[in-house]
A protein has these predicted regions:
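Positively charged, small/polar-rich N-terminal and surface patches that mediate targeting and assembly
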Residues: 1-97
Length: 97
């Protein structure tokens, strides 16, 4: 099992969750109106006068065989609109309840 944290510009709104459902991933936790700045490129998303945009984030836990499909979807969306900001981070989950 893997955990995937996806941070994205709020302009994507539910597009990320809807795309995950199309892949067969139903469960997730979403945070809205979070701030941040990418480590390499892109503008800050801080919700202030200088940087008014904000991010959302999703955390999902999926079987290993779903990871490549999710990352391919994320990569494709990011390549379509690179200025918005969209990143996914995957880590191992040893146990869950």
């Amino acid at each position: 099992m893997k955990g995937i944290f996806i941070a994205y510009d709020q302009a994507y709104n539910m597009e990320i969750a809807d795309a995950m459902e199309e892949i067969g991933v139903r469960g997730f936790t979403m945070w809205q109106d979070i701030s941040g700045r990418g480590s390499e490129t892109g503008e800050p998303h801080l919700g202030n006068h200088a940087w008014p945009t904000m991010n959302n984030a999703i955390l999902t836990f999926v079987p290993d065989d779903k990871v490549d499909d999710i990352l391919a979807m994320i990569r494709a969306k990011d390549e379509e609109t690179p200025a918005l900001g969209l990143r996914a981070f995957v880590w191992n989950v040893e146990t869950s309840y």
